[in-house]
Amino acid sequence: MNRRVAIINDLKRYDRMAYLNSVSIISAFGDRAYIDIEEDKKYDAFLSGYIADSSKILEYRELIGDAKLDNQRALFLCDPVFADNGKRYENITDTHIENYKKLMEVSDIITPNFTEALMLIDEPYKENCEKYKIIKYENDSKEKIDILSKKIIESFFPILNKIRFKKNQISVITGIELYNAVLTILDVYDGDHGKRQTTCNYSEKIEDRSGAGEIFDAMFFETSTNGFNLVDSLSATTSFINNSLRFSRDKNIDPKLGIFFEPILYENLMVMRNKLIERNKQFKGEENVRH
């Protein structure tokens, strides 16, 4: 699509491999990835992740806010990277978290993991974590999945209602561990019309590797702005991450080296493209039947 996408992520200093995941995926979709923001350039989208200096978070808020005023179609995906597995990262202060909240006030999409989501709204981690870890995912029938999803979504509404930082916002909470699966919650809230769509996505537990968050953000951004609806985008994104984790494991890649996905990126993009074509054909067929 040849869009200018600014990537704001201090992992380029600490974990270059994870950081480059974003660049690889954005480039594969035909967009141009820019490292950080230059004030004299115009951007079509912004992806933010780990920001080491808490004061810089507010600077980015102002820069992105001004950029979105100049280009109202510019999209901002904010991943407030500061914690995991119930614990903050070493250098994270209360100021970091408060400033991330302010940054999310100008974002269109937020993608915190479960720990970050709970910390952002001052909810206890252990109690919530234990509540979901006992839930068993059974996929032997669509009816069972639908019943489970409805139950989980209803239990999640108090969290989703608190974590929304602007009137119209897409919230994606990742890394929610169930007994035998990993859950991702997508909540699309349209405050202008009082509409809401919330859905669950279940994926296999494989293994933890650095860089999954950067892959998720870049792939979800690209698929959701390249013809996929948000539910299909989430499904395509989690499927790609799982395929990449399996590939890394099967190739005996050291987990310290992150996720090895480049050899299967093109193949997976072709699968996504074909699914999108089939879905569009199906949609057109349904439209013809209705008319």
Regions found by a protein language model. Give the residues of each.
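Glycine-rich phosphate/adenosyl-contacting loop at the front of the ribokinase-like
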Residues: 1-36, 283-291
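Short pre-catalytic strand/loop immediately N-terminal to key active-site residues, enriched for Gly-Thr
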Residues: 12-14, 197-211
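Short acidic/histidine-rich motifs immediately flanking catalytic phosphotransfer sites
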Residues: 40-45
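A short helix->loop->beta-strand "cap" motif at the edges of active sites that frequently abuts
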Residues: 65-76, 165-169
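Conserved phosphate/ATP/ADP-binding segment of small-molecule kinases
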Residues: 90-196
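Short, small-residue alpha-helix embedded
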Residues: 119, 206-230, 234-236
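Short, well-structured alpha-helical segments that form the helix of a local strand-helix-strand
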Residues: 148-163, 229-245
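Charged C-terminal helix
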Residues: 231-291
